[in-house]
């Protein structure tokens, strides 16, 4: 058996070598286009080997590397090649993302050419018909994107297979027994790929880490942590550096700072928050509001180029998974000297804004300060004061109540002004997963976005805008939060789609104003099609990112925007704090400007990439726990709303934010047809219909933790 396998692999290697030789021959500067008969003569191909040459030529054509003329002559392809990153689909096809291309390039399964998920590939793009998605062929793999993969191990007698958690990987991995590290069936393992395989051969790898058994508490989330390569522990060098950081603010630390310790100010956070990096204050100056947004001066303790700083940049952001937080900075810092704890002297960077009744910032000051918060407030208690008018809570915080009432007044003014200019508010309910001590979900519910959370959101937004505008006009190197305008093609598609529901978008000069999208979302609010149109509107927009150019934030309809308010958990905020402080201290000379100009593009790119990674990991843990939660409710009945309809079924969203699929194959009472113009499934005999926004009772049929999917069946 082993000898036969060796012969097969030897033949494959010979074939690939001959294919390379033929292609190299055609790439020679002296080569002239030839017919197959001429190629046989020049290359000395025997009559019995001609079928193999024909197959080689067919393969090279399929890969887009050579072309066949109308006269039957072969030559090297002159089609322009493009480089991008391949995103695989479990059904074999995929997409290549090319920088500068508004849409991904579709790669049919037959033209994937051995590429795997996240590989950097070279492609040729096929001629495209107007209005259709671009298609291409993968010519070669330039660099493998995945070196290690998290898998479930399946042991056999003399070998094992590792089944990747990421179904996009497309195949399981052969593990020789001597490279299994003693893993047993059911173990979650990290596999390092040693060979990516060739035609007819699976990839091979070795187990480098056993995470734990699939049934052990915490193994599921830890597997996601490993899959996204999220750094968890801090090195001894970093922790030693942290131990040397002062635990208290000294008089020397306060020197040269504005002393605001006698100002009335509070932090407002969730009950569980320990890293309190923002405080707010408010007083009236005549008819004007003086709003202070006071941010922990983390840069005072994280010095540029230190081991701690290098690690913070590498992480880019804190990651908030359902059962744990993976912090950007060690907790000794983020929960200690950098946390604006009640009654403690703390160093801060404050943005103090004078705002008139129209919501206009008519004056502002950005300063290094020393502060002391009066109370550590929670969103719950501030809501009880402002919305619920809870007498007991109002009495407990009676000295702060007048300030909270003025804050609510100002927040409403700021929100109204933002909405007037066209700011878009996607009010999708976020999910809160409640876990027991072993990490199992015991409840899932929508996150409560109330008057208190919105108040803090409004204040942070105006501070971020004010700081960004200040530094834009000073022409100082900076990191901005940018949200580019949507591509005109995507907006055109959205416009065509919403016409089916009687809505229109006013598009001028090939672009849309954010106010148009805001109006659309307001029109669909409360309608059956709200969920679908809101999601499609979101998908038509670009992702926000960090840049060194200030080109505005489309979603907020803001000309200037940055992230200034969360330096404990976001590196861009920490980075601009350093810039602001150097500028305040008069040290922003030509050398320092050149320094920042040389590093900020890389900082912005790293921060954008780590943010994407964190968001994906966070989403995966929520989806995983939703599956686990619903697996404990198999056979139970729930009422939900149809949130999406396709030709293969419809999606139902429950009040707790869980979404599942009712497959059309499970609608056994009739034959159902899909009507794309109205997004309905209709029974051909009964005319029974399933449409967007329709309330429906469903039974939980099955869940798949690997695929992160939930299937429902109609209860009736």
Regions found by a protein language model. Give the residues of each.
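Electropositive polyanion-binding surfaces
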Residues: 41, 195-196, 223-226, 230, ...
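Charge-lined substrate channels and their catalytic hotspots, especially those that engage the 3′ end
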Residues: 2-292, 299-345, 383-384, 679-681, ...
């Amino acid at each position: 058996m082993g000898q036969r396998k060796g012969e097969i692999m030897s033949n494959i290697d010979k074939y690939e070598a001959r294919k390379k030789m033929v292609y190299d021959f055609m790439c020679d500067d002296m080569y002239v286009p030839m017919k197959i008969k001429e190629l046989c003569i020049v290359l000395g191909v025997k009559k019995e080997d001609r079928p193999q040459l024909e197959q080689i030529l067919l393969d090279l054509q399929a890969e887009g590397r050579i072309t066949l003329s109308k006269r039957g002559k072969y030559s090297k392809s002159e089609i322009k090649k493009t480089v991008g990153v391949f995103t695989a689909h479990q059904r074999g096809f995929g997409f290549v993302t090319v920088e500068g291309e508004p849409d991904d390039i579709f790669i049919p399964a037959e033209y994937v050419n051995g590429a795997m998920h996240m590989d950097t590939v070279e492609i040729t793009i096929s001629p495209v018909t107007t209005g259709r998605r671009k298609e291409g062929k993968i010519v070669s793999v330039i660099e493998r994107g995945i070196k290690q993969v998290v898998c479930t191990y399946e042991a056999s007698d003399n070998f094992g297979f590792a089944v990747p958690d990421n179904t996009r990987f497309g195949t399981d991995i052969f593990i020789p027994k001597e490279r299994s590290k003693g893993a047993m069936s059911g173990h979650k393992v990290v596999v390092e790929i040693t060979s990516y395989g060739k035609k007819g051969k699976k990839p091979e790898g070795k187990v480098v880490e056993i995470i734990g058994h699939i049934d052990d508490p915490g193994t599921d989330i830890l597997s996601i942590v490993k899959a996204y390569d999220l750094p968890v522990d801090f090195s001894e060098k970093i922790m030693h550096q942290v131990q040397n950081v002062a635990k208290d603010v000294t008089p020397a630390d306060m020197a040269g700072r504005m002393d605001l310790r006698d100002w009335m100010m509070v932090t407002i956070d969730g009950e569980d928050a320990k890293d309190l990096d923002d405080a707010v204050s408010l007083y009236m100056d005549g008819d004007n509001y003086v709003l202070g947004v006071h941010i922990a001066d983390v840069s005072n303790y994280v010095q540029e180029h230190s081991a701690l700083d290098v690690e913070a940049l590498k992480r880019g952001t804190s990651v908030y998974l359902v059962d744990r937080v993976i912090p950007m900075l060690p907790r000794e810092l983020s929960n200690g000297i950098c946390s604006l704890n009640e009654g403690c002297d703390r160093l801060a960077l404050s943005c103090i804004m004078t705002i008139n009744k129209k919501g206009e910032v008519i004056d502002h000051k950005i300063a290094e300060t020393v502060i002391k918060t009066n109370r550590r407030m929670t969103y719950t208690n501030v809501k009880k004061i402002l919305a619920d008018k809870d007498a007991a809570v109002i009495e407990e915080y009676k000295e702060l109540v007048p300030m909270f009432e003025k804050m609510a007044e100002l927040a409403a003014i700021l929100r109204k002004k933002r909405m007037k200019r066209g700011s878009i508010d996607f009010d999708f309910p976020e999910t809160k997963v409640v876990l027991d001590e072993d990490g199992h979900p015991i409840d899932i519910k929508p996150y409560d976005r109330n008057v208190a959370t919105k108040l803090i959101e409004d204040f942070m937004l105006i501070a971020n805008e004010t700081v960004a505008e200040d530094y834009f006009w000073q022409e100082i190197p900076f990191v901005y939060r940018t949200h580019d305008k949507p591509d005109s093609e995507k907006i055109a598609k959205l416009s065509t789609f919403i016409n089916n529901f009687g809505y229109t978008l006013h598009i001028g000069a090939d672009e849309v104003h954010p106010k148009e999208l805001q109006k659309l979302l307001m029109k669909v609010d409360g309608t059956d099609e709200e969920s679908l149109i809101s999601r499609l509107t979101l998908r038509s927009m670009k992702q926000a990112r960090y840049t060194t150019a200030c080109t505005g934030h489309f979603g907020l309809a803001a000309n200037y925007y940055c992230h200034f308010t969360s330096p404990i958990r976001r590196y861009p905020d920490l980075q601009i704090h350093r810039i602001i402080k150097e500028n305040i201290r008069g040290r922003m000379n030509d050398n320092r400007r050149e320094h920042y100009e040389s590093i900020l593009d890389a900082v912005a790119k790293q921060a954008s990439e780590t943010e994407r990674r964190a968001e994906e990991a966070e989403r995966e843990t929520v989806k995983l726990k939703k599956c686990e939660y619903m697996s404990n409710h198999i056979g139970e009945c729930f009422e939900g709303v149809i949130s999406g309809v396709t030709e293969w079924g419809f999606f139902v969203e429950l009040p707790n934010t869980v979404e599942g699929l009712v497959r059309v194959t499970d609608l056994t009472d009739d034959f159902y047809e899909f009507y794309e113009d109205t997004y309905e499934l209709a029974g051909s005999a009964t005319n029974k219909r399933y449409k967007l926004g329709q309330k429906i009772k469903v039974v939980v049929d099955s869940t798949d933790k690997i695929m992160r999917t939930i299937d429902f069946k109609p209860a009736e």
